[in-house]
From Swiss-Prot:
It is a peripheral membrane protein. Interacts with TGFB1I1. Interacts with integrin-linked protein kinase 1 (ILK) via the first LIM domain, and in competition with LIMS1. Part of the heterotrimeric IPP complex composed of integrin-linked kinase (ILK), LIMS1 or LIMS2, and PARVA. GO terms for molecular function: metal ion binding. The gene is LIMS2. This is LIM and senescent cell antigen-like-containing domain protein 2. Keywords: Cell junction, Cell membrane, Disease variant, LIM domain, Limb-girdle muscular dystrophy, Membrane, Metal-binding, Nucleus, Phosphoprotein, Repeat, Zinc.
Length: 341
């Protein structure tokens, strides 16, 4: 376009805002082909010039950044700031792409997608883990899905068995697969190797073996059924197919002393329908030691030596004697009257 044609075009042009013509020496603002007087190129809300020429356009009207945010920009559900540019709409809220993150692992979800879980937005792996936790199941560490059947445990992690093949024969593995020296084998191939299997963890035993309860065990896995501490070569006691350390075997199955309430180790004194340590069986009045050969009487469910008994008031001794006679009479079997029939 020649200079004369340009002048003619400007002479016929009008301001986009006020529709007035331009004077020949006037400065004109051109915004995407739209012409404005310099004083007309202002924010449609506050009527002020755009700071540094930056403006936002909405429905044919131009706004400064502040007014555009106040009028139209959504607030981020995470940081609370206005969102300019891409908006993520999810969970009945608006988000900056960088603010919309998994509530458990903090990974960005904008381009990954998310799953709603108990009012939370989670990435799919975290959702699967939470789902598995609620069902009491494992999550496969390869595909990150719930393992509905029995998992294959490999290097302390759970997997779907069909992700692996036997190192020896190449067959797809099942949950019965065995790990040996960092490799996985199907059960038949593993059994051919003659490696013992631990009765606790069901894994091969490559070092020292403990033979007990008709099974083989890793040393650290052969433990007391009560306290779960390894025996580590110490003596164990067996009961109904389980192994116990001496302390807990005595606590569970041994006699408890009526006096000290401890499990009785060694000889047991049985008297007054109770069990006593040899050292605890004594006169409850003078504390002199008693044996079953000594004469004693029962008073307040405890033994009293003959010497202390003789010091009791006469009335008390009569009552004790009568009580003893009644007790012995009840203990005797009743005679049958043959003439009563």
């Amino acid at each position: 376009m020649t200079g004369s044609n340009m002048s003619d075009a400007l002479a016929n042009a009008v301001c986009q805002r006020c529709q007035a013509r331009f004077s020949p020496a006037e400065r004109i603002v051109n915004s995407n082909g739209e012409l404005y007087h310099e004083h007309c190129f202002v924010c449609a809300q506050c009527f002020r010039p755009f700071p540094e020429g930056l403006f936002y356009e909405f429905e044919g009207r131009k706004y400064c950044e502040h007014d555009f945010q106040m009028l139209f920009a959504p607030c981020c559900g995470s940081c609370g700031e206005f969102i300019i540019g891409r908006v993520i709409k999810a969970m009945n809220n608006n988000w900056h792409p960088g603010c919309f993150r998994c509530e458990l692992c903090d990974v960005e979800l904008a381009d990954l997608g998310f799953v709603k879980n108990a009012g939370r937005h989670l990435c799919r792996p975290c959702h699967n883990r939470e789902k598995a936790k609620g069902l009491g199941k494992y999550i496969c560490q390869r595909c990150h899905l719930v393992i509905d059947e029995q998992p294959l445990m490999f290097r302390s992690d759970a997997y779907h068995p069909d992700h692996f093949n036997c190192t020896h024969c190449g067959k797809e593995l099942t949950a019965e697969a065995r790990e040996l020296k960092g490799e996985l084998y199907c059960l038949p191939c593993h059994d051919k190797m003659g490696v013992p299997i631990c009765g606790a963890c069901r894994r091969p035993i490559e070092g020292r073996v403990v033979n007990a309860l008709g099974k083989q065990w890793h040393v650290e896995h052969f433990v007391c059924a009560k306290c779960e501490k390894p025996f580590l070569g110490h003596r164990h006691y067996e009961k109904k197919g389980l192994a116990y350390c001496e302390t807990h075997y005595n606590q569970l199955f041994g006699d408890v002393c009526y006096n000290c309430s401890h499990v009785i180790e060694g000889d047991v004194v049985s008297a007054l329908n109770k069990a006593w340590c040899v050292s605890c069986f004594s006169c409850s009045t003078c504390n002199s030691k008693l044996t079953l050969k000594n004469k004693f009487v029962e008073f307040d469910m405890k033994p009293v030596c003959k010497r202390c008994y003789e010091k009791f008031p006469l009335e008390l001794k009569k009552r004790l004697k009568k009580l003893s006679e009644l007790t012995s009479r009840k203990a005797q079997p009743k005679a049958t009257d043959l003439n009563s029939a």
